[in-house]
Amino acid sequence: MAEKVKEKDFVKVDYTGKLPDGTVFDTTEEKAARDSNIFSEKMNYSPAVVCIGEKQILPGLDEQFEGKEVGKEYNVTLPPEKAFGKRDIKKMKIVPSSTFREHKINPQPGLQIDIDGQMGTVATVSGGRIIVNFNHPLAGKEITYTFKINEKITDTKDKLVSFLHFTLRIPEDKIEAEVKEDKATITLPIDFPLQITTMLAHKLVELTGLKDVLFQKKGAEKK
């Protein structure tokens, strides 16, 4: 009988996302990216390591993983509210042209900009009135994903490293994890505030079943 996965399982999964017209906009597979002309040298095309239920990828897709069989391919269609949200007219905002002049930007329809930490796309330009759309570019669209869970990760060290890689955006080869019985010591190349490492330690204990997780900066004594 095929193995099924559940919430809090760590898995390696390949997936490809498509729009209703078949256009590929997201994939973990290099061949699919090249065939769809969206290949980027900056991307690392390999199976994504995901902890089910932690919303490390699109939440609507994450929900689909629970209860699925390892090695079996699935197709799911996500409505806008489970994908990138419905289009919200309130997210269409008028931005004064002076804001663009201050940053020496020439606003043109289709230009993507960051205003106060919000990503938006210039919709129209008319005199001193520039309308910027702060909806996600795929908001309001139904999307389809094809995915396959390749394997379930059982090694505790691999779970620790993969979760911290995703959460802290630190390369996996820069994260050291030592596991002895029911305790783990994590060595990071950056010294994070105690509040952050304490929060991460609690989360890792919850996800891995360890009794204790300690953090230390590289070259420091264990604390």
Report the location of each language-model feature.
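FKBP-type peptidyl-prolyl cis-trans isomerases
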Residues: 1-223
